[in-house]
Amino acid sequence: DKLAMKANTRQLNGIGAFCDDMRDALRGPFSDDHKGGFLAGMPDMEESLKFGIVGAISHPQIDMTRVNYSKEAWTNSPTQMVSYVSCHDDLCLTDRLRSSIPGITEDELIRLDLLAQTAVLTSQGVPFILCGEEMLRDKKGVHNSFKSPDSINHLDWNNLKRYPQVFNYYSGLIALRKSHPAFRLANADLVRKHLSFLDAPKGVVAFSLNDNAGGDSWRDIIVILNANKQPTDINVPEGEYTV
């Protein structure tokens, strides 16, 4: 109980932790680069992803017995959780997708990359993005590049020209989050009050932010994360929506 570790974050006012529950739910476990997660269509990842979406707080719609690593909430506030899918340690996102999904096409890689960061940037908590992922960075499959040369760690700025759609999508996600306080609610009570999950099939996580959450100009917001290769149908509350 005296260690400053993730499990004890609730005792550390003003200090947060990276959410490996969410990271590994999205891309697969740290222990096996070739095993995928939600993005690869692996089953039973939804509850762990939902836990990350609420900022690792307690929430009545989350079954903690089905969360991958944590069996109880480990934050008092969503601001104590860092939401992310990759960082300087381990494989970067594009390398992990290639490693865990054999034969993945470039189109699939881009779509799943964007899906992952949509989850990160629409979740409660503090989003974190590895430098260069906004232009589909890779590190040639090197698992931990701290001792690798510049040929592995450098940023290939030509990727901005190769993948402008990726850069523009990331920019749009950041602008969306900055413009809408519903995605960055200040405390756990507000998250429990305004964020609810919708019924969804396997491979899909859907949630709504209701009643001008956080003073948002949008009354209701619906986010649907579909990792399946086929379209899906989700019943949403009656109303007029802009897609």
For each feature predicted by the language model, list its residue ranges.
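Conserved alpha/beta catalytic core and glycan-binding cleft of carbohydrate-active enzymes
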Residues: 1-131, 135-136, 146, 210-216, ...
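Carbohydrate-interacting/catalytic domains
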Residues: 107-110, 119-135, 139-243
